[in-house]
Structures are given as structure tokens and as C-alpha cells.
Design a protein with these regions (language model features):
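Catalytic histidine-centered segment of alpha/beta-hydrolase-like enzymes
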Residues: 131-144
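Short, hydrophobic alpha-helical segments
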Residues: 147, 151-153
Length: 153
């Protein structure tokens, strides 16, 4: 799937075979270390990432039963990916104004996924920022300005 990194490999394995073994392999995504990594990977200056986001995520991830809910969501994300062709058909047919702001160093959603919007909506505006998955953590003002500018047109 275009735009999805190899980081999805264990999740895709679970989609293909929702066994307890594959489900257990996804628990690595729910550790405090992985949550911190998701917030900081690809960020040139990790001191710009407030601990609020990953600390709050970790607080909620450690609540009883939350791990099972998250694992169910990983499994269900397959239904979202299955709808990608429908989203793309909508974009090709209706050509809505489209702004995609992307962390160019996102370890899960790669730049080709954002660039694909331009294939379906030739006027799509795609911006890449020097950051990771949680682009708002480090580029909130820049993203807000891009959205305001986009909506003003």
C-alpha cells in the first residue's frame, strides 16, 4: 500500500491472521518507550516536543482494558485502508480543495501517501515539514497558518 511504511508490517500480519500470536506482537506499540518514540522519531530537536502528549497517552494506555481496545483498533484499521480506493474515487470525481500537511519523517505514513493526493486532485496542496508523526507537536503555528491561508482562498 502506497504511503504506508514497513512499520505497518506487524499490523498487516494481524490483518491477514488475527491470531493471538500476531495480536501479542502488537503490544510493543503500546509501551511507554514506543509512545515516546512515536512522538520524537524524525524530530530534529526533540526538546521541542512537550512531554504532555506522550505522558497523557501513556496514562491512558495503562488504564485496565485500554490495551485490548487499542489492539482491536489496530485490527479494525484494515477497514479504513480498504476504503482508500473509495476515497480516491471521490477525490478524482469531485476534485475538492485539498490541503495535506505531512511530517516528512513520519515513520508510519510516508511522503508518497501525501503525494498521491496530487494524482487524484491535481490542485491539491501538499506540504512537508521537517518533523515526524505528530507534526502538530512541533509545527502547530505553521500548520495553523497553512490551514488559515487555505481556508481563506
Amino acid at each position: 500500500m502506497e504511503g504506508l511504511s514497513n512499520g505497518w508490517k506487524p499490523i498487516r500480519a494481524y490483518w491477514q491472521d488475527p491470531s493471538e500470536t500476531n495480536r501479542a506482537a502488537l503490544r510493543a506499540f503500546l509501551t511507554p518507550e514506543t509512545t515516546y518514540w512515536q512522538y520524537t522519531h524524525g524530530v530534529p530537536d526533540t526538546s521541542a516536543v512537550s512531554p504532555d502528549g506522550y505522558s497523557l497517552d501513556n496514562f491512558y494506555l495503562t488504564r485496565p482494558g485500554t490495551d485490548e481496545v487499542q489492539l482491536d483498533l489496530f485490527g479494525d484499521y484494515k477497514s479504513n485502508v480498504a476504503l482508500y480506493p473509495d476515497f480516491q474515487a471521490y477525490f478524482r470525481t469531485h476534485k475538492p480543495p485539498l490541503l495535506a500537511v505531512w511530517g516528512k519523517n513520519d515513520p508510519f505514513f510516508l511522503p508518497p501517501g501525501a503525494d498521491a493526493f496530487k494524482r487524484d486532485v491535481p490542485g491539491a496542496e501538499v506540504r512537508f515539514l521537517d518533523t515526524g508523526h505528530f507534526a502538530l507537536e512541533t509545527h502547530c503555528n505553521e500548520i495553523a497558518a497553512a490551514i488559515r491561508d487555505f481556508l481563506a482562498r
